[in-house]
């Protein structure tokens, strides 16, 4: 051992069972303020004995490492592990991993490297998946690279409980988690809402993608659009200890070229300062006929990691331009059977255009006041602008009308432009202390979001007839394009308190908390600027969870959580027009069991029920929350490394979804629109034994049929998609090079995707090639 000299430390209560050393170090990080850095191969095959008692953090570390031959050096709360060298000294670290011990750190990758051992849960901090009473999955940058993911949608589809409601090349991306919609506007970045593009999130800025299944309002506050099925948080890149200079060139069909640079460097004493820059230039033909898609993106991340102080800042700018984007269509009420989907490269409305610009800045500061008290504050600001040449289906007289049974429709052109300005903040304190034999982790937090949004809608007069199989270019748009004016102003604030109690040597973990939410919404006339309506409301969102570990590798868990969605202002077509409905709550009950099979495979079985009020009119045409959508489900997941070099990601979800408490029994017991009864995923990634550096991968995605309406008279067929890929890692002229090739929708399957009552044709067979060079 070669520790640096430290000041006398106060002992803390430590209870860590015998288990693999990596898991034991994660628990040590969560019970103390130590940040532990190490290379993956340092811990290979190492196990830790059980330790307990009132120990200083360093003494606890010594006991865990006893007999392993692993050395450590310490600077403040930063600890670096290394293997002893037979000739003396230590072995240099190759790839550094950080335990998820305190705020701001990333959990180490799990076996196989595609997912992480834990992730952030907002107010509850960073937790190992085996220690949290929720169902989560945390994707690593390795997976993003190897699958050649382009946007966030390409990542989250790896889990059967998550489905994309839109296809690539559209005007935006929306998701579904546990049968409920989650929009791109409800994705958080580094724990803050409202700071990523409301249309699509490019993966080039991402280090991790963290998915929570089930309502997440307690963790980070109300999402801007009130999603309740789950929560998605993305984590931006930071510089590693090893310098990085990577250039990637990519190609995607039909002829879309991407160039990316990824630079990272740490410097200063103990590599305390880090800088990470990513730049992307993309352009060329998209997967749609006569389509073009471009992206210009730059992202700069700076961070400082000191003994007690940690700070980070990000600046992100992206500009997207899509000529002929993939659109959605609706169906006339008389349609009882959908026509066959057209080819995947057909755009229903030739001549559409989308341009989008987003700029974001954000910063986060964390400080350890003592070994057992940490505070943080984070803030960010985003401006977004969107300009669209947008089609509208009408009848020959110009009145709104959808597509008929044979795919015929009439279309006029509109301009729909919008802007948004968002300020977002988060602050909190986390304290650790004991009451007798019970350990507490108490978190106090506050969240704030203000979002101003504006729009302008200009309608043309020319109308042309068209068909989904042989679309006609949309006509000329209006002669005047209006400037977007303020339409709404939303402020969401909340205060939360939570306590996680540990009993019986951390074999029982109990979490309880409550968040008080305040909602303020004002609407404005975009012509006069006058305030037309508004409301103020508040509500409390409690949470409860328990984890019981009968064995060190088995976690039995249960939770109760609530989602909260801001209320709506009743429209003019109802008897109670102008009435303000209170924010409504969605309730989840969940239980499950997680098993970590010798650190190689983790499996999860989860049972859940989510009930959400449904807004509709009663027999007197009074609008309110009179019905309920209830989703009851079973989830099975497994991920990790089956054998050395064979990686697995498999999952299945079964949802019994029905409408209950409906006014007058209308549609009572029916299946809600857009919710599949079953979904399946199977992904394998294999390092071939006959060619060093060559890996093959494949993925199957199955989604059952769904209804397009609550009356269950119009059904959308299910689909199965197959993807294949390969990569080859080698060295050329002393430089590490990785070649990748992927094919999505290998069979060129034609199928519909549904988002609410609208559908779009899925992208056809798509080829992707890339080469990455590390200088």
Question: Predicted regions span which residues?
Answer:
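Acidic, small-polar-rich N-terminal luminal/periplasmic segments of exported/outer-membrane proteins
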Residues: 30, 35, 94-242, 591
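Outer-membrane beta-barrel translocator/receptor signature
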Residues: 204-207, 217-298, 304-310, 359, ...
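Acidic/polar loop-and-plug regions of large Gram-negative outer-membrane beta-barrel proteins
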Residues: 282-286, 299-366, 383-420, 463-492
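Structural signature of Gram-negative outer-membrane beta-barrels, strongest in the C-terminal barrel
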Residues: 303, 420, 439-451, 486-612, ...
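Surface-exposed extracellular loop regions of Gram-negative outer-membrane beta-barrel proteins
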Residues: 321-333, 450-455, 547-590, 602-625, ...
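Membrane-embedded beta-barrel scaffold of Gram-negative outer-membrane proteins
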Residues: 366-368, 374-380, 384-392, 557, ...
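Conserved C-terminal beta-signal and adjacent last beta-strands/turns
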Residues: 442, 558, 589, 673-775
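Gram-negative outer-membrane beta-barrel transporters
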Residues: 609-611, 625-710
